[in-house]
Amino acid sequence: MPWIQIKLNATNENAELIGDMLMEETGALSVTFLDAHDTPVFEPLPGETRLWGDTDVLALYDAEADTQLIMSQIKASNMLAEGFAYKIEQLEDKDWEREWMDNFHPMKFGQRLWICPSWRDIPDPTAVNVMLDPGLAFGTGTHPTTALCLEWLEGLDLSGKTVIDFGCGSGILAIAAIKLGAEKVIGIDIDPQALLASKDNAQRNGVADQLDVYLPQDQPEGLLADVVVANILAAPLRELSSIIKGLVKPNGQLAMSGVLDTQAEDVANYYRDELHIDPIVEQSEWCRISGRKQG
């Protein structure tokens, strides 16, 4: 059945209150917050709000909803300034699962690595192919930080090497490393669900025997790897720099992402005491910091 969507422009100070009012007083089936200027917020600074300064509040109603009554209730709430901007539109009914699936295509990284959803044909059967379906929480290659790490791994000779995926999420980097020739890969994550996702995805790719996963407190003592990749965020890369450096063998290599261009130099400085840092690589305001540990 079709749906009715009402979009209101709000500020970050009242967006959540407006959302609550729409759910409780006007019968909205769902409420979504979007940045009115398409500006993503991935890692707020301490004390910053997670909403944007100019926020669109989207409320969804069934097709029989009385929009005049809803608008009168919104105006009566006095939560929005007089003459506030809004938009009412009817959304056609669709096969939303099919629409969602159609948005995902095989993606190529470097010269020979492909990440492919399971419902798509493999573009090049002779290439290195990782089969991975998009999920709700973990990486699938679409974000620049994941892409930067995949391209870096694809450019290495991983034959016979041990790799640590620090903050493994879906296991995409760990699985790619195995498919690219790594002998053994260890995934570490603070989220037990990430460890389950990594093992499940490794099983689907036929490489589960080469992947061990651990919560940080459970990882083996003295764990070392030839290659370490950490696609997390700037704050934990700074806070955990001693731990991450300690996972890299002498002459081993490290790559980190989840870092904005404005944060890259500061994060890199936490690693310069033990690593020779490569030129920082940027993609869509995100950066990859890589280097080799001194022997």
UniProtKB/Swiss-Prot annotation:
Keyword Membrane part of the UniProt annotation: no
Keywords: Cytoplasm, Methyltransferase, S-adenosyl-L-methionine, Transferase
Single annotated GO MF: protein-lysine N-methyltransferase activity
Primary location class: cytoplasm
GO BP, sorted A to Z: methylation
Stored CDD domains: AdoMet_MTases (cd02440)
Reactions catalysed, as given in the entry: L-lysyl-[protein] + 3 S-adenosyl-L-methionine = N(6),N(6),N(6)-trimethyl-L-lysyl-[protein] + 3 S-adenosyl-L-homocysteine + 3 H(+)
Location within or outside the cell: Cytoplasm
Binding positions for S-adenosyl-L-methionine per the UniProt entry: T146, G167, D189, N231
Record InterPro entries: Ribosomal_L11_MeTrfase_PrmA, Ribosomal_PrmA_MeTrfase, SAM-dependent_MTases_sf
Enzyme Commission code: 2.1.1.-
Pfam families for this protein: PrmA (PF06325)
Gene Ontology CC: one annotated term: cytosol
Disulphide bonds in the chain: none
Matching HAMAP family: Methyltr_PrmA
Function text: Methylates ribosomal protein L11.
Similarity section: Belongs to the methyltransferase superfamily. PrmA family.
Protein's name according to its UniProt entry: Ribosomal protein L11 methyltransferase
Organism, as annotated: Vibrio vulnificus (strain YJ016)
